[in-house]
């Protein structure tokens, strides 16, 4: 069982689920690759276990295995025949030379990929092995599926020596930002897999050149959109077909399938966001509210056409200025209190009561004026026929004029009634 192998298998499954797979896509195979496919890989197996089951299993998968149960003997053999070994598998718990010591020696003096194996899978053990340059970590018992693909470390080592970071990518092509980050991860992983450099060696032997980032110019993006439209729809567009159309029909050079795949994924996400309809906001917003019916009615009541000017609130009007018609009043329904800080009021009820009381006051004054004039006239006319003694002892004469705009019951207010006291209370 291999920790790295499980991670690689899981990542492969995730990629197959997320990215549409194009049939017929394969890495280019050159003559060197064909030679590697037919060639057997030479493996040095170092372990204290005398059981040869692992060796027999590796032999079934066409590995040429040389096995040692002593670390010192294995290291001596490796010093003399380092050019005849393609892969080293070393037990982490060897008594004389453990796995970390072997990684240190091989990393300084040789250029071989080293795989560490152990019966335990503690994180500390795995992390230490990786830090010292192990390209893989196997947990005993090792399955046949893991053994079957151990040759990938030898193949990756050959690619790193020939300067091929990834098949199918040109050194002059700019990489996407996401691809650039992935490339850094791959380079770090490959340097660990080489098993030939420790931590200090990695810092000293960094590659002086890095691939520049991919720049999708507006013109290049327009050609990309033309290619997508040519496919019929965004769902039918695949990186391989888009790249082929851009290279053959639009004469675009320097692009790779990974560049197009990354840009296509971002383009799909952007299209989904653009096509998603905006849901109406259900939350109440004051800006969307309709007109305030109460406030509109209050403004109507307080307008100069419907209400006398002395009934409109003034910020600095004294108590006695209610009857002053020449003072300009603001057309608002706010009362001034506490240093002219206004608050809203509902003046409808107050104005109705106040107008009714003023009407009563005017009617009473009109009645008093009419009554006084009539009484004066009767007194002058009837004083000639009525003796003075009779007038002194008789009750006051009450005369009602039917032409007045009020009834006889409304002539006199109740005893003790004062219109100005009523206005002050209200």
UniProtKB/Swiss-Prot annotation:
InterPro entries: ARR-like (IPR045279), CheY-like_superfamily (IPR011006), Homeodomain-like_sf (IPR009057), Myb_dom (IPR017930), Myb_dom_plants (IPR006447), Response_reg_B-typ_pln (IPR017053), SANT/Myb (IPR001005), Sig_transdc_resp-reg_receiver (IPR001789). Predominantly expressed in mature pistil tip. Also detected in the shoot apical meristem as well as vascular tissue and hydathodes of the leaves. One of its GO terms (biological process) is cytokinin-activated signaling pathway. Keywords: Activator, Cytokinin signaling pathway, DNA-binding, Nucleus, Phosphoprotein, Transcription, Transcription regulation, Two-component regulatory system. Two-component system major event consists of a His-to-Asp phosphorelay between a sensor histidine kinase (HK) and a response regulator (RR). In plants, the His-to-Asp phosphorelay involves an additional intermediate named Histidine-containing phosphotransfer protein (HPt). This multistep phosphorelay consists of a His-Asp-His-Asp sequential transfer of a phosphate group between first a His and an Asp of the HK protein, followed by the transfer to a conserved His of the HPt protein and finally the transfer to an Asp in the receiver domain of the RR protein. Residues 161-216 are annotated as: Disordered. It is found in: Nucleus. PROSITE patterns: HTH_MYB, RESPONSE_REGULATORY. The modification 4-aspartylphosphate is found at residue 91. Residues 175-193 have a biased composition (Acidic residues). Pfam families: Myb_DNA-binding (PF00249), Response_reg (PF00072). GO terms for cellular component: nucleus. CDD domains: REC_typeB_ARR-like (cd17584). Residues 213-268 bind DNA. A motif (Nuclear localization signal) lies at residues 210-213. GO terms for molecular function: DNA-binding transcription factor activity; phosphorelay response regulator activity; transcription cis-regulatory region binding. Residues 194-208 have a biased composition (Basic and acidic residues). It comes from the Eukaryota. Binds the target DNA as a monomer. Belongs to the ARR family. Type-B subfamily. NCBIfam families: myb_SHAQKYF. This is Putative two-component response regulator ARR20. It comes from Arabidopsis thaliana.
């Amino acid at each position: 069982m291999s920790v790295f192998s499980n991670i690689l298998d899981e990542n492969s499954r995730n990629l197959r689920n997320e990215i549409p797979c194009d049939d017929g896509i394969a890495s280019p195979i050159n003559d060197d690759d064909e030679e590697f496919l037919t060639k057997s890989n030479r493996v040095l197996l170092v372990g204290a276990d005398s059981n040869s089951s692992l060796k027999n299993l590796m032999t079934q998968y066409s590995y040429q295995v040389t096995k040692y149960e002593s670390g010192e003997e294995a290291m001596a053999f490796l010093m003399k025949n380092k050019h005849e070994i393609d892969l080293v598998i070393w037990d982490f718990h060897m008594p004389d030379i453990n796995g970390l010591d072997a990684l240190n020696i091989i990393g300084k003096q040789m250029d071989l990929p080293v795989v560490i194996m152990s019966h335990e899978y503690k994180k500390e053990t795995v992390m230490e092995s990786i830090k010292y340059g192990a390209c893989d970590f196997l947990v005993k018992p090792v399955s046949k599926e893991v053994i079957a693909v151990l040759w990938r470390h030898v193949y990756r080592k050959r690619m790193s020596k020939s300067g091929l970071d990834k098949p199918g990518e040109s050194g002059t092509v700019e990489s996407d930002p996401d691809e650039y980050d992935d490339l850094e991860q791959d380079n770090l992983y490959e340097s660990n897999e080489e098993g030939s450099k420790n931590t200090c060696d990695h810092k000293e032997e960094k590659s002086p050149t890095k691939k520049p980032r991919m720049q999708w110019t507006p013109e290049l993006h327009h050609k990309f959109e033309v290619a997508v439209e040519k496919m019929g729809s965004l769902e039918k567009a695949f990186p391989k077909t888009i790249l082929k159309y851009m290279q053959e029909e639009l004469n675009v050079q320097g692009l790779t399938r990974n560049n197009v795949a990354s840009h296509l994924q971002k383009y799909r996400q952007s299209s989904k966001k653009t096509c998603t309809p905006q849901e109406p906001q259900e939350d109440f917003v004051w800006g969307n509210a309709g007109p305030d019916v109460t406030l509109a009615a209050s403004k109507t009541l307080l307008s100069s056409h419907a209400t006398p000017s002395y009934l409109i609130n003034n910020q600095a009007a004294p108590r006695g200025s209610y009857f002053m018609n020449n003072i300009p009043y603001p057309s608002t329904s706010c009362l001034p209190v506490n240093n002219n800080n206004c608050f809203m009021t509902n003046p409808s009820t107050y104005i109705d009561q106040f107008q009714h009381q003023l009407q009563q006051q005017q009617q009473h004054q009109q009645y008093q004026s009419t009554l006084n004039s009539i009484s004066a006239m009767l007194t002058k006319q009837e004083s000639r026929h009525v003796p003075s003694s009779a007038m002194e002892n008789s009750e006051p004469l009450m005369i009602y004029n039917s032409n007045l705009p009020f009834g006889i019951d409304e002539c006199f207010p109740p005893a003790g009634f004062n219109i100005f006291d009523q206005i002050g209370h209200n």
